[in-house]
Structures are given as C-alpha cells and as structure tokens.
C-alpha cells in the first residue's frame, strides 16, 4: 500500500514539474516575442533627439529574466547602424536616462508608478500593465485571443521626440494620451 502511495506521489510531483516547465517555456516564448516586438518598434522609429549618445542602442529593463531572453534574441542585431546593448536598470536610478528604450514588465508596476519620468524625456517607454500608458508610457502589450497585441499613444511618442512608422501604427490599437 505504501509503495502505491509513494508511486502516485512521485507521479504527481513529476506532473507538477512538467506543468512548471511548460509554463516556464511559455514565459520564455512570450519574452522572446516581446523582445522581437521591441526590436521592430525601435527599428521602425526615429529618435529626433538621442537619449544619450553612447555609440550603441541601449535597451533597458528592470527585469533580469526578460533581459536574459532579450539578450539571446537580439544577439548581434543592430538598430539604425548601432549594436544593441541590453542593460539591467533600477527604475529609481539616474542611469535610466541613458536608455533608448525601456521595457517595464508587470512585476515592476509599483516601481514604475514612482519613477521620475523627467529622466526619460527621449526614451521609448514600453510596458504591459493595463494602466501603463495612463501612467506615462508610450506602448503597451496586451493579450487578445491568446496573441500578443500592442497599443500605442503616438502623441506621447511625439512629445518624446520619437516618430514611429505608420506601418507599425497601422498594426496597433491607437490610444490617446492618458486614455486606456
């Protein structure tokens, strides 16, 4: 009897590990897709004023798990002739003013609320929480029918001196600044 219980416990643990592995794989896949979107957002946008000219395009996030995937996906890619540097930043740090693009995952929503947005005047701001654009962001990812979609606040981008291609805007849901 004990042997049967132990067997079923082992099977249960294996099933839980398999479910966890599938969830981790889905999260990695979603992060990889979002990194690809970020690459294309940057590729099809023009910065009228560089955030801080440093000789490379700096993609930042406070989420190290996302950055691990983004580093792999964006390895040896370029944006406007510049190599991409993926950088971990803290949202309360002055270093965020050196980012060309900042991606804020849902885990960092509370820090985003208190972030000094004046440090991000010429930075493309992308997030994934429902109120991200209302809280000062430019682009927000959301899921619809199991697919990653995005919405853009073009007027907010314009205030940051960033012009996004109309081709990308046609693929997005357009929102007005402060709306969601």
What are these regions (language model features)?
Residues 2-9, 22-180:
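Short hydrophobic alpha-helices and adjacent helix-cap/hinge residues
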């Amino acid at each position: 009897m004990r042997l049967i219980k132990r067997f079923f416990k082992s099977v249960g643990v294996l099933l839980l590990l398999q479910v966890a592995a599938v969830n981790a794989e889905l999260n990695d896949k979603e992060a990889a897709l979002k990194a690809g979107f970020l690459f294309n957002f940057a590729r099809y946008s023009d910065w009228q004023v560089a955030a801080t000219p440093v000789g490379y395009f700096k993609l930042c996030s406070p989420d190290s798990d996302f950055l691990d995937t983004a580093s792999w996906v964006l390895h040896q890619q370029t944006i406007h002739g510049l190599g991409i540097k993926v950088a971990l930043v803290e949202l309360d740090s002055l270093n965020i003013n050196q980012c060309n693009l900042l991606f804020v995952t849902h885990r960092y929503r509370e820090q985003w609320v208190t972030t000094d947005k004046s440090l991000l005047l010429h930075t493309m701001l992308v997030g994934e929480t429902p109120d991200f654009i209302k809280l000062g962001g430019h682009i927000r990812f959301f899921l619809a029918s199991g697919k990653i979609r995005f919405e853009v606040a073009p007027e907010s981008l314009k205030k940051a001196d960033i012009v996004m291609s109309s081709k990308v805007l046609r693929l997005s849901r357009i929102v007005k600044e402060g709306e969601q």
